[in-house]
Amino acid sequence: MNILISNDDGYHAQGIQTLAETLRDAGHSVTVIAPDRNRSAASSCLTLMEPIRVHQLDEFNYAVIAGTPADCVHLALNGFFEQSFDLVISGINHGANLGDDVVYSGTVAAALEGRHLPYPSLAISLVGRKSEGHLFGNNHFDTAAKVVLDLLPKVQKGIVPARQILNINVPDLPYEQVKGVMITRLGHRSPAAEIVKREDPRGATIYWLGANGVPVDASEGTDFYALAHNYVSVTPIQADMTAHYSIQALKDTF
């Protein structure tokens, strides 16, 4: 397959480098176009009010200067390259994209930019483990890359409809310790913690965003549940954000 890879951690990140190398070793044609720096949580932001510059690192690797993940894939699929691509893979992200994370995720946004291609895009993330409440890892990027290789033949069967993508989260474990794959729905987190107010060395007030919310819907069938039990979660998602279940109630009201 002719595969385009991007991410939100930057072209230098271990995750994207491991993924590209693994896919090339498996015989796929791989082109990497990614931000030149970490753009985590950029969501689907596009650069519209200023020009975009791209630095060619070598024949198959490109860095978008100050670009977002969505910029990268948008450029790649709309005239930057003469070639066409079969599939977009975004990742391997350094950390989870579970539940409500997908709203903010640059990893997921990059995959969504590829929704018009013949095969559903993949957003893949490596989920670090916790010890005494603290996250550590990510170490097993090779595991996540192998999971991608396992999934590609299934993706090529055309089971997933056009315009959908697969959001994939992989436990940070040796490949042999991963129990399998669960097809899941998105779970839900609580609201984020309160912002943190501080004072900089010059006396000006500054703010940090609070910590991410904790899972409040991690029941069986969710992506949170799969990861908690050492399974890979595969969740089909789409750009269509219509709340279809509310349409009739609104029609009846208006």
Curated annotation (Swiss-Prot):
Its cofactor is a divalent metal cation. GO terms for molecular function: 3'-nucleotidase activity; 5'-nucleotidase activity; exopolyphosphatase activity; metal ion binding; nucleotide binding. Belongs to the SurE nucleotidase family. GO terms for cellular component: cytoplasm. Gene3D superfamilies: Survival protein SurE-like phosphatase/nucleotidase (3.40.1210.10). Its EC number is 3.1.3.5. Keywords: Cytoplasm, Hydrolase, Metal-binding, Nucleotide-binding. It is found in: Cytoplasm. It comes from Actinobacillus pleuropneumoniae serotype 5b (strain L20). The gene is surE. This is 5'-nucleotidase SurE. It comes from the Bacteria. A divalent metal cation binds at residues 8-9, 40, 93. Binds 1 divalent metal cation per subunit. SUPFAM superfamilies: SurE-like (SSF64167). PANTHER family: 5'-NUCLEOTIDASE SURE (PTHR30457), 5'_3'-NUCLEOTIDASE SURE (PTHR30457:SF12). It catalyses: a ribonucleoside 5'-phosphate + H2O = a ribonucleoside + phosphate. InterPro entries: SurE, SurE-like_Pase/nucleotidase, SurE-like_sf. Nucleotidase that shows phosphatase activity on nucleoside 5'-monophosphates.
